[in-house]
C-alpha cells in the first residue's frame, strides 16, 4: 500500500527544508510515519497477516535509524520533528 501521490507531495511540502528537498531525514521520517499510520488499521483487521507485518517492522526500524541519525547530528531538529509528528520521546 503506497502513500497517495497527493498526500505524499503534501507531506514533502510540510517537512521539506528547501524547495526541492525530498531526501532529508525529516521528509523520510514523515513519509515513513504516514505509511505506518495508514497500515495500522489493516493490522487491526488482519491480525494474522505476518507477511505484511514484516514489512511494517522494516519501516519502523528504518524510521528509528533515521531518527537516531538525526538525534546524533542535530538534536533541535530531532525534537522539533518528534513534536510535529506526535511521536514518543
From Swiss-Prot:
GO terms for molecular function: rRNA binding; structural constituent of ribosome. One of its GO terms (biological process) is translation. One of its GO terms (cellular component) is cytosolic small ribosomal subunit. InterPro entries: Ribosomal_uS15 (IPR000589), Ribosomal_uS15_bac-type (IPR005290), uS15_NS1_RNA-bd_sf (IPR009068). Keywords: Ribonucleoprotein, Ribosomal protein, RNA-binding, rRNA-binding. The keyword ATP-binding does not apply. The keyword rRNA-binding applies. One of the primary rRNA binding proteins, it binds directly to 16S rRNA where it helps nucleate assembly of the platform of the 30S subunit by binding and bridging several RNA helices of the 16S rRNA. Part of the 30S ribosomal subunit. Forms a bridge to the 50S subunit in the 70S ribosome, contacting the 23S rRNA. Belongs to the universal ribosomal protein uS15 family. This is Small ribosomal subunit protein uS15.
